[in-house]
């Protein structure tokens, strides 16, 4: 029996898979930098005069958005929307832009239910190939959006790309988790999130106006995700299928052994086969649980509600408001080069995501989540204070910028990765697929709400917007302190007992029997 090791085939397969995660991140971040360029093009398509500089500048400042990056001479002069164009046309532009951002999350929300199903039906490799069809269609629609009704093509392309990302957000972690050696499963699994934030960072860099984020090349920037989609599709033909899928789902032991020999670089795969045989026996003795049963069964109700709250905390903390509209926020904060500050956010996001890979296995999940949320609360307060006092104290722009950087850092320490870890640890094999699907749906739904509403909230609240998010973060921090148990190193039985304790009720005999049936002696 050989020790777990990293082989060339394993590295190739993992890097191929996380190209999908990279596309996911690229699609999240790509819409930010060319924001005003795209809005200007929308105005052109809808017949609003492009030389109406005052209205453009008023829109950029009053809605906290980036000033135009196009070749407009002179200094911006803020004026009222009402003086330059009708309320209806102004609302239409805002609605179309918000929809361009948020339709991505609608696609992800819908597709998040079907990633696991597609992977089980077609296999992990074929499922990722099929998903890439959606990625290519979405990218091509956006690539050619400059030639037609741009608002329709961009919104359609973003929606289809969202469908792709909803599928891939389940398929990639599933595949790399199943091919990874036990010793490296945690680190390899974390590469999914690392590839996402790397994709965000790359989209921010090449979205600079002197690269692709300008009036001539913005459509290429949006459609560039077609490149990793084509590359991944070609590379997938050389990747071995998941041995767990072959053995546990299809009962193809010979094919599973062949796949394992390639991945492990050894003819001795007894250890993996034994582990998979045990997993298959456990899975066959455990009934599957539907999404409805998660809420109707008393054994699952408290864990699933806490799981949903953790994902709501992640999204409603305001983090995606920063990711989607960071350039606008820095513009409002008085930063002279807001796009570069946005890239700084992406770089910090990447660095602290890598750091969290090590922290999450050393410290408790609940502790890191509380530290992250508490830090975000303080940063949100300083962010708003900086924005409110900016007119009187210009140096407050640096306070706001520093607060944003720290806000992102605290997010990646705890609320970013932790909910996904904890949801998997709340549930054993039977209810886990339904719980993860419900958690993914909740995450995408909240993502959509923030993407659609953040701009309207920012318009209404002005510089006080992050006071609102500070209040939300405080509520979720208190909820975590009183209701969320620590899961690191505990069995499902111990976690279930913690939930009963925090809900203030003793475990019923029926619930105890159910938890025993669900394999409550397993340690996470």
UniProtKB/Swiss-Prot annotation:
Extracellular compartment spans? 27-89, 146-150, 212-216, 328-338, 390-394, 459-463
List cellular component terms (GO): brush border; plasma membrane
User: Any inhibitors or activators noted?
Assistant: D-glucose and maltose competitively inhibit fructose transport. D-glucose, D-fructose and maltose inhibit deoxyglucose transport.
- Where are the Phosphothreonine modifications? 523
Top-level taxon of origin = Eukaryota
- Coiled-coil intervals: none
SUPFAM superfamilies this protein is in? MFS general substrate transporter (SSF103473)
> What positions does the entry give for D-glucose binding?
193, 314-315, 320, 349, 412, 420
Q: What reaction(s) does this enzyme catalyze?
A: D-glucose(out) = D-glucose(in); D-fructose(out) = D-fructose(in); L-dehydroascorbate(out) = L-dehydroascorbate(in); D-galactose(in) = D-galactose(out)
Q: Which GO terms describe its biological process?
A: D-glucose import; D-glucose transmembrane transport; dehydroascorbic acid transport; fructose transmembrane transport; galactose transmembrane transport
Instruction: Using the UniProt annotation, give the residues that carry a glycan (glycosylation sites).
Output: 62
Q: What does this protein do?
A: Facilitative hexose transporter that mediates the transport of glucose, fructose and galactose. Likely mediates the bidirectional transfer of glucose across the plasma membrane of hepatocytes and is responsible for uptake of glucose by the beta cells; may comprise part of the glucose-sensing mechanism of the beta cell. May also participate with the Na(+)/glucose cotransporter in the transcellular transport of glucose in the small intestine and kidney. Also able to mediate the transport of dehydroascorbate.
* Protein name stated in the entry: Solute carrier family 2, facilitated glucose transporter member 2
Give the organism, scientific name: Sus scrofa (Pig)
């Amino acid at each position: 029996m050989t020790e777990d090791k990293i082989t060339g085939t394993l590295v190739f397969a993992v890097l191929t898979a996380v190209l999908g995660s990279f596309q996911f991140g690229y699609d999240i971040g790509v819409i930010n930098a060319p924001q005003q360029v795209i809005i200007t093009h929308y105005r052109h398509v809808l017949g609003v005069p492009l030389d109406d500089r005052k209205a453009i500048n008023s829109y950029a400042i009053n809605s906290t958005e980036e000033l135009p990056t196009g070749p407009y001479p002179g200094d911006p002069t803020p004026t009222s929307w009402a003086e330059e164009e009708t309320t209806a046309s102004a609302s239409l532009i805002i609605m179309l832009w918000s929809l361009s951002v948020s339709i991505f999350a609608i696609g992800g929300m819908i597709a998040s239910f079907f990633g696991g199903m597609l992977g089980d039906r077609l296999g992990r490799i074929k499922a990722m190939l099929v998903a890439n069809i959606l990625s290519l269609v979405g990218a091509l629609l956006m690539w050619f959006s400059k030639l037609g009704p741009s608002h329709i093509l961009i919104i359609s392309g973003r929606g289809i790309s969202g469908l792709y990302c909803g599928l891939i957000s389940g398929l990639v972690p599933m595949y790399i988790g199943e091919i990874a050696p036990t010793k490296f499963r945690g680190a390899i699994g974390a590469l999914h999130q690392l590839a996402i934030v790397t994709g965000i960072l790359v989209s921010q860099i090449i979205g600079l106006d002197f690269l692709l984020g300008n009036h001539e090349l913005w459509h290429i920037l949006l459609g560039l995700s077609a490149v990793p989609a084509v590359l991944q599709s070609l590379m997938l033909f050389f990747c071995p299928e998941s041995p767990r899928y072959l053995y546990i789902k299809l009962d193809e032991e010979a094919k599973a052994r062949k796949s394992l020999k390639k991945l492990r670089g050894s003819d001795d795969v007894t250890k993996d086969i034994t582990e998979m045989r045990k997993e298959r026996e456990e899975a066959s003795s455990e009934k599957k649980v539907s999404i409805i049963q998660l809420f109707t069964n008393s054994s699952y109700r408290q864990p699933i509600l806490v799981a949903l709250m953790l994902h709501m905390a992640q999204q409603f903390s305001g983090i995606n408001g920063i990711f989607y509209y960071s350039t606008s926020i820095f513009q409002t904060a008085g930063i002279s080069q807001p796009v570069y500050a946005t890239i700084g956010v992406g770089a910090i996001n990447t660095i602290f995501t890598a750091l969290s890979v090590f922290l999450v296995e050393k410290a408790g999940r609940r502790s890191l989540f509380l530290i992250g949320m508490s830090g975000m609360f303080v940063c949100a307060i300083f962010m708003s204070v900086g924005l409110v006092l900016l007119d009187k104290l210009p140096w407050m722009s640096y306070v706001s910028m520093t607060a944003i950087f720290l806000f992102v850092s605290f997010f990646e320490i705890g609320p970013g990765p932790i909910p996904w870890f904890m949801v998997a640890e709340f549930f054993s094999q039977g209810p886990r697929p339904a719980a993860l699907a419900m958690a993914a749906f909740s995450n995408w739904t909240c993502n959509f709400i923030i993407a659609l509403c953040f701009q309207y909230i920012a318009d209404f609240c002005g510089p006080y917007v992050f006071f609102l998010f500070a209040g939300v973060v405080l509520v979720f921090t208190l909820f975590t302190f009183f209701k969320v148990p620590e899961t690191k190193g505990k069995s499902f039985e111990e976690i279930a007992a913690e939930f009963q304790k925090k809900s203030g009720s003793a475990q019923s005999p029926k619930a105890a029997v159910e938890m025993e049936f669900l394999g409550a002696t397993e340690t996470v």
